[in-house]
Amino acid sequence: MAIRETLKGGKGEVIKNPKVFIDPLTVFKDIPFREDILREVAIAVRYFVKNNMKFSTLFLGLTGTGKTFVAMYMFNEIQEVKKEDGEYGVVSQAYVNCREVGGTPQAVLSAITQRITGEEVPKHGINLGEYIERIKENLVDKKALIYLDEVDTLIKRRGGDIVLYQLLRANADISVIMVSNDINIRDYMEPRVLSSLGPTIFFKPYDAEQLKHILSIYSEYGLIKGSYTDEILSYIAAISAKEHGDARKAVNLLFRAAQLASGEGMIRKEHVDRAIIEYEQERLIEAIKALPFHYKLALIASMQASDVITAHKIYSDLCNEYKQKPLSYRRFSDVISELDMFGIIKVKIINKGRAGGIKKTIEVADKEKITKALEEAMQLEYEDTV
């Protein structure tokens, strides 16, 4: 009977509208604490559409500071304005998450071209210039506003900043909004690319009070009244504020805590604490997916070895398998130390005495989760190479 009540969403339910947490743009009519940024971007877009003033800007800030939210909100608002203002009818928009499409110059340009032209475009077999030409051909008497989310994935690839340069300097009405949480992203760009960039807009971390306000909006629209307390919202906000004011983390914790409280009618501290543990585990998986290729190979080797010397031998074999030049033992040892620093593996140094020297052992906790993350990550690496 309890399962039937759960299926029907009966007594003790906490979540009123889960879509609020999955697609918040359907709820938020404005974005709190980011109004000035929205206004600045809206003015740039208006000048672009009505006065032919192209622009480019970089949204820069730590994870969960509202960069993607602002970009997607602007995208949606422009789509609505197109219905009301004829001058916006000539604007085509392309929103591309560089990491999700693969991150290579070809993959990103293919996605942009497809969204602008509405035609299927191959990821391989076409040079970069041809993608740009196809976009330009489609923009005769038209304008394009291109959003490049997680643009650092593209920039750090060979030839990635050339893509930006070609877009920014193309003889066409193209404006670009880029999003990155790597505060050092500009260090990866060539001087000619930097000189083509417009202003950088910095997104400051939210403080605890701001996070609590944001959570109150999600709670109002997404949770059943009386299923949460002001203290619970403050608790989640305080935890998230300690970690660079991450609103995404705060919202995810609230939603997961609400799911854990389903059937009990009230979100309690124990639900939030369980949600925190799960969140940290999921973050570990995402961190593994974001590792450079040789770090992934080093981690695979570490899963199969008990010490660093053996791991390096396995790693070297993997490099041969993937047709990669292996890192030296010294550099490999540095990579292992970094993986230890990230908390993905644990390295112990055993002193075997004057005759035995020093041995570095490797321990890997939660191998099942790490193996799953590695399988997904290596599949993405494989797709990039075919």
From Swiss-Prot:
- What's the protein name? ORC1-type DNA replication protein 3
The organism named in the record is Sulfolobus acidocaldarius (strain ATCC 33909 / DSM 639 / JCM 8929 / NBRC 15157 / NCIMB 11770)
**What's the encoding gene here?**
cdc6-3
| Disulfide topology | none
Q: What GO molecular function terms would the record report?
A: ATP binding; ATP hydrolysis activity
The free-text function statement in the UniProt record for this protein reads: Involved in regulation of DNA replication.
Residues binding ATP are T65, G66, K67, T68, F69, Y206
GO biological process, any: DNA replication
Q: Which InterPro entries match?
A: AAA+_ATPase, AAA_22, Cdc6_C, Cdc6_lid, ORC1/CDC6, Orc1/Cdc6_arc, P-loop_NTPase, WH-like_DNA-bd_sf
